[in-house]
Amino acid sequence: GVGLVGSEMCIRDSSIADYITLNISSPNTERLRDLQKGDNIDEFLHSVKTLHDNLKKVYKKHTPLVVKIAPDLTNQSVYELSQLINKYDIDGVICTNTTIDKSSLSEKYKDIQGGLSGKPLSTKSNSVLREIVNNVSEDRTIIGVGGIDSWESANEKLSIGANLLQLYTGLVYKGPQVIRQILRY
């Protein structure tokens, strides 16, 4: 299936990684987001998890496996994905990648390719984060991403239930000192 070859290569090298991200949500890869739906994701996670478990036996090392999801999923899709994350004992979820929803942009920017990140992503990302927190097993690691550029936005993700945070756009616009500002509180 789509994405399995790359995932196999990554998992085979997992003995040198701290964790592996299955990014099934990139808006820049044609048909990749289709993996988040129905039988596609079930088959994909089953195949990847089987390979992951086999390699864990070979290398005698558990490298956590996390799935990075899109903010554009419906609540029903997030629920179904949560059930599969539980079923296949996936270690964690990264909530979320960039959005393909450009409705908040002015007309002149709506046709630009790629995903929208940063502050415009916060509401959607937090909604998906909330659904994931409510539906995956408590032992899963939840990584909050999307619109983090201050202590307040970081704290909001943690208050919803994220265990860890990732940020990128905040670093681009505010520089590395944004990390110190967040950690100062």
Spans of features found by a protein language model:
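Glycine/Thr-rich beta-alpha phosphate-binding loop at enzyme active sites
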Residues: 28-40, 84-138, 174, 178
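Short beta-strand/loop segments at the ligand-binding rim of alpha/beta enzyme cores
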Residues: 55-71, 132-144
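Active-site glycine- and acidic-residue-rich loops that bind
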Residues: 7, 33-41, 66-86
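Single conserved hydrophobic/aromatic residue that forms the stacking wall/gate
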Residues: 1-11
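Hydrophobic faces of well-ordered beta-strands that scaffold small-molecule active sites
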Residues: 20-23, 65-69, 93-95, 141-146, ...
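Glycine-rich phosphate-binding active-site loops on the catalytic face of alpha/beta enzymes
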Residues: 24-26, 92-102, 153-181
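Loop-centered beta-sheet repeat module
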Residues: 12, 16-56, 68
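Catalytic cores of alpha/beta
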Residues: 73-87, 134-138, 148-165
